[in-house]
């Protein structure tokens, strides 16, 4: 018979196997930050905290960032319930979750070394799906290996009175995490204060939707006859396109730092779409003269669903997952180094003095700054 606490939504018999999967995955990551001179204390036998130290000799700084995934795993849950494939999609969801914080921390020139996660559910029953739990743990392991960070600790609360997903999804956790990055030597710190008129804007291609604009995608998909099972011209369903994992830009930034490129600012292409380019509060105009290929999901939303272009550009990354602001003299070298590191980069525009906005010349549209 279940305990009174289990009947109230917190069942440790379901939670414990999940925790052990995550702890086991985390232990396999502890050596990953060694390549950056950071070492995890492996004598800590629980997941209540991660203890780490820097063994290098360079003067250094630490950078800490916390970010949540948002609603993207709601789509994963819908697909798991309805697409008939048995795929949970949670390996890629784990990567999305971690990269929300990781792609932010590198904007300061910090390289990720430690990550802690939170998987908050509405009911402990969610933890009882062994396949989904295994996929999530494996996804966290894989992204830690890719970017060079450890997962020494985490949190997995059951919050029945706080977390209740919208139907038809019956259960979905709130996913988030905190990353610590190291800036070594400390002179590699990038604050954005060097951004200036004349700088070139280099855009790095996204893999697709990433994790912004999800609420709009869900709303519009549920209005379609086949919802997330709607077939797109790519041969994949709308749900499959939406769940393509976020791209990591760690290797790109690490390459530029290693080659001592004069980067004036770095910017993740996340909230506010292309309009986020005008994040700096100074009176700069961001003139975009060229653009990357637009992912098919965005084209579908514009052409088949009829979403106005202004909404598209202010909601989605529109094909650019990261921006680099560099002096004109560095633009060509940045694109070449990025290609060598495996990224598609394009010199898409220039920073100019003027009204704070984004002039998107390929479509003849002017976008206001974030929050407007």
Regions found by a protein language model. Give the residues of each.
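Gly-rich Lys/Arg/Thr-decorated short loops/hinges at beta-loop-alpha junctions or inter-strand turns
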Residues: 2, 72-84, 229-237, 282
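Buried hydrophobic packing segments
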Residues: 51, 101-102, 217-220, 252-256, ...
């Amino acid at each position: 018979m279940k305990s009174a606490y289990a009947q109230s939504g917190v069942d440790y018999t379901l939670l414990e196997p999940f925790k052990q999967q995550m702890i086991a995955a985390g232990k396999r990551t502890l050596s990953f930050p060694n390549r950056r001179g950071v070492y995890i204390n492996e004598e800590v036998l629980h997941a209540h905290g991660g203890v780490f130290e820097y063994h290098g000799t360079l003067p250094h700084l630490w950078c800490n960032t916390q970010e949540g995934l948002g609603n993207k795993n709601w789509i994963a849950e819908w697909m798991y319930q309805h697409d008939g494939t048995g795929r949970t999609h949670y390996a890629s969801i784990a990567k999305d979750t971690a990269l929300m914080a990781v792609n932010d921390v590198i904007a300061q020139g910090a390289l990720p070394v430690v990550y802690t996660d939170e998987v908050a559910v509405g009911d402990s029953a969610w933890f009882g799906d062994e396949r989904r739990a295994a996929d999530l743990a494996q996804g966290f392991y894989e992204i830690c290996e890719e970017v060079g960070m450890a997962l020494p600790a985490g949190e997995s609360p059951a919050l029945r009175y706080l977390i209740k997903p919208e139907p038809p999804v019956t259960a979905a956790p709130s996913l988030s995490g905190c990353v610590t990055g190291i800036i070594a030597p400390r002179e590699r710190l990038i604050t954005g204060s060097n951004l200036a008129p004349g700088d070139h804007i280099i855009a790095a291609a996204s893999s697709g939707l990433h994790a912004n604009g999800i609420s709009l995608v869900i709303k519009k998909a549920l209005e379609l006859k086949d919802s997330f099972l709607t077939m797109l011209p790519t041969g994949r369903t709308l749900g499959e396109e939406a769940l393509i994992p976020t791209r990591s830009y760690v290797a790109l930034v690490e390459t530029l730092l290693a080659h001592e490129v004069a980067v004036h600012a770095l910017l993740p292409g996340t909230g506010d779409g292309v309009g986020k380019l005008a994040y700096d509060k100074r009176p700069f105009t961001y003139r975009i003269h060229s653009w990357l290929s637009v992912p098919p999901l965005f084209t579908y939303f514009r052409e088949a669903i009829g979403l106005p272009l202004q909404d598209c550009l202010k909601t989605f990354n529109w094909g650019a997952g990261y921006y680099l602001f560099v002096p004109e003299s560095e633009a060509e070298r940045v694109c070449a180094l990025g290609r060598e590191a495996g990224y598609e980069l394009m010199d898409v525009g220039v920073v100019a003095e003027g009204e704070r906005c984004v002039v998107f010349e390929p479509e003849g549209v002017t976008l206001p700054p974030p929050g407007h």
